[in-house]
Amino acid sequence: MKKFSILCIVLFANSYFAFAQTESMAAKVAATAMATLWKEQVGADTAKPTKWTYDQGVVLLGIERLWIQTANPVYFSYMQKSMDYFVSENGDIKFYKAQDYNIDNILCGRILLTLYNVTGQLKYYKAASLLRGQLKGQPRTKEGGFWHKKVYPYQMWLDGLYMGQPFYTAYAKQFNEPEAFDDIANQFIWMEAHARDAKTGLLYHGWDESKEQKWANPLTGCSPHFWGRAMGWYEMALVDVLENFPATHPKRADLIAILKRLVDAIKKVQDPATGLWYDILNLPNEKANYLEASASAMFVCATAKAVRLGFLPASYLAVSKKGYDGILKRFIKTDEKGYTNLEGTVSVSGLGGKPYRDGSFAYYMSEKVIVNDPKGVGAFIQAANEMEWHAAAKTGKGQLFLLDDYYNAEKKKDIKGIEYAYHYKWPEMYNNGFSFLGNVITSNGLRTGTLSEAPTANNLKNAAIYMIVDADNVADNPTPNYMNE
């Protein structure tokens, strides 16, 4: 008990002092975003017109991770106000049209799931389920890949994997849809199979199954270039999906192999002088090409997160460190108002549409590069969160913290009637604070685990800490387990 108490004091002290230090770069850019973007949704002045958009979701995902890291309620309040602008009490979403079958519209569903898990308010579940319903009807290629949009028939874009699959995975995990995981894995497998260039290992921005688009190679259906942000979307999608993907699923290894091939290719086109990446990844010597902030932030974020979660070896963190240093030196600027701004993000790049975007190098170079584009800002906040996690001291590195699920074995049914372990469990995001406790523990380098059987010398031999919280009685559990030794 004494050893446990001392370690807990050290863990919480480390976390307190980490939070009390000078404001982090993630927090500085988040403060700028909250003060200047989408003001009408959070009651500020000088509102900007807005719509239900993935751009906002990218920023909110960065703010969500910052909230988890700091437990600062300001971040949660901002997330909730941002979504409450759109979500009615009956779960409808303002400006959202499911019949558009636009996969971009799915991304904010991840924030809706968080809000539901924290507050229990049904409107967030209903809104998230609307988005899940869209995926059930989303048009597909012949083999089953999601079309990017209804107005872009037969096309898969790298972007679309980030827009749809992490939400699809989180929803399937939470609401017991095990059959979805094959479908989710196949989206990445098919995208790589069609878009990967064998010579460089890089992935083309888009693939047209019909080969009818002007931008499509008549033999392969691929677009002409390797656009940096598109590959950034794809890498972030892979890592975010793997975070919630079943550990025992047979296709998990396929996804990790795709991730490693992808990052190995990305490493080769990292600019050796700055650590950054070009807008068109493999053409650094083209005069019009430029180092681009959002792609660089995405590669930094996804690679660092993959290392944190154990999907890539620790040696890959060097890629992220070099890239992050480059971003701070080249793209982060403080203005006269004290805002911390991100320069150097291309506002948009796409394929087809009106006016028609032909996927040529000249087209990509024609799009505007702007300050504080939400896609870049959101990716940077996420990247900074990851790099700040890696920079913190890891007092308990490599040790295992086991939580009891035998003496405290309460069960509850979710909204779909599926029974799950309940009350002081690691995933819980509501007021008991256990998800935050778990984050404090993992932020200090430990691993968390759960023991669902009676403790023995054998099943505790690898654990540094074993914790029992609120053991059951018959009021909690009709068949409680009691200690007999």
Where are these regions (language model features)?
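N-terminal, post-signal-peptide region of Sec/Tat-exported proteins
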Residues: 49-86, 422, 428-435, 439-451
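Short, surface-exposed patches at the edges or C-terminal ends of soluble domains, predominantly
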Residues: 393-485
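Oxyanion-binding "anion nests"
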Residues: 235-284, 288
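Long, well-ordered core segments of solenoidal/helical folds
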Residues: 22-43, 77-95, 126-145, 178-207, ...
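Inter-helical turn/loop segments and adjacent helix faces that build the functional surface
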Residues: 171-182, 241-253, 306-314
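Solvent-exposed loop/turn segments at secondary-structure junctions
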Residues: 66, 85-86, 241, 284, ...
